[in-house]
Swiss-Prot record:
Signal sequence segment: none
Domain of life, source organism: Eukaryota
Active-site annotation: D34 (nucleophile), D36 (proton donor)
GO CC terms, sorted: cytoplasm
Entry keyword Acetylation: no
Species name: Homo sapiens (Human)
EC top class named in words: hydrolase
Protein's name in the database: Glycerol-3-phosphate phosphatase
Lineage: Eukaryota, Metazoa, Chordata, Craniata, Vertebrata
Keyword Electron transport found: no
Pfam families: Hydrolase_6 (PF13344), Hydrolase_like (PF13242)
Annotated keywords: Carbohydrate metabolism, Hydrolase, Magnesium, Metal-binding, Protein phosphatase
Length: 321
């Protein structure tokens, strides 16, 4: 049963048939796609997804890719898109379609730390996140393993800190540790130090319906220790959409957000006035949609897409007709 039928009066979240897709695409210039769980799972493309995106390009549609994953640079994501068959520009402009949280976090810190002499950030994250920061003039420390120093709390409290750290940035960090958490807290106790999280995704979809813990788990740990909230860059934050809009000159009324998560992709689209499509190849399910439709919570009712598809490969009949 379609979620719209299950949700009573809420007419949103109808299956995107070929006929509906043709009508929708006639009124759309730009399609923004999440990546993990939408285009691919791990290193495997969703069947039919590359063909669908190549067909959209052939129709003259402008594509953008908005990912909360901070473990890759824009250039690395552009290379993965080409490697898995999704097409896209080559050469110096290859990465311009990609808006990842590593890149957008760098833009945010460049704004917030403008005028600061030799800005520096303590990064709980990947070399890619550090590289994007350094590309805009923000030095980074902290990337990589950081074992406990000393025998107990007194030693941990007095472990040396880098001078002039003006922000703690929390991204996806497979080396996250108690020592890093303690250092982050100590930096955040210094006056004026910012706390920035790349995203709040609680888990990441991989192949065969499996998941791993996401960045949101790490951000929450730092927030709890510091007793303050982080500035969040990724979806559903408006900031990441503003990054896209400034570079693309988007008309929201002629733009679609396609994603697999109600609480990030679909909520971002609803907040920014975009049409939304949920694909069922990732995290959220039609059961989740039904729960949101039937909820009395206003914020949950925003997390209901206009349309849904089993996979973005479902767009192919509309594009080939």
């Amino acid at each position: 049963m379609a979620a719209a039928e299950a949700g009573g009066d809420d007419a949103r979240c109808v299956r995107l048939s070929a006929e509906r897709a043709q009508a929708l695409l006639a009124d759309v210039d730009t399609l923004l796609f999440d990546c993990d769980g939408v285009l691919w799972r791990g290193e495997t493309a969703v069947p039919g997804a590359p063909e669908a995106l190549r067909a959209l390009r052939a129709r003259g549609k402008r594509l953008g890719f908005i990912t909360n994953n901070s473990s890759k640079t824009r250039a690395a994501y552009a290379e993965k898109l080409r490697r898995l068959g999704f097409g896209g520009p080559a050469g110096p402009g290859a990465s311009l379609e990609v808006f990842g949280t590593a890149y957008c976090t760098a833009l945010y810190l460049r704004q917030r730390l403008a005028g600061a002499p030799a800005p520096k950030a303590y990064v709980l994250g990947s070399p890619a996140l550090a590289a994007e920061l350094e590309a805009v003039g923000v030095a980074s420390v902290g990337v990589g393993p950081e074992p406990l120093q000393g025998e107990g709390p007194g030693d941990w409290l007095h472990a040396p800190l880098e001078p002039d750290v003006r922000a703690v940035v929390v991204g996806f960090d497979p080396h996250f540790s108690y020592m890093k958490l303690t250092k982050a807290l100590r930096y955040l106790q210094q006056p004026g130090c910012l706390l920035v999280g790349t995203n709040m995704d609680n888990r990441l979809p991989l192949e065969n319906g499996r998941f791993i813990a996401g960045t949101g788990c790490l951000v929450r740990a730092v927030e709890m220790a510091a007793q303050r909230q982080a500035d969040i860059i990724g979806k559903p934050s408006r900031f990441i959409f503003d990054c896209v809009s400034q570079e693309y000159g988007i008309n929201p009324e002629r733009t679609v957000m396609v994603g697999d998560r109600l609480d990030t992709d679909i909520l971002l689209g609803a907040t920014c006035g975009l049409k939304t499509i949920l694909t069922l190849t990732g995290v959220s399910t039609l059961g989740d949609v039904k729960n949101n439709q039937e909820s009395d919570c206003v914020s949950k009712k925003k997390m209901v897409p206009d349309f849904y598809v089993d996979s973005i490969a479902d767009l192919l009949p509309a594009l080939q007709g």
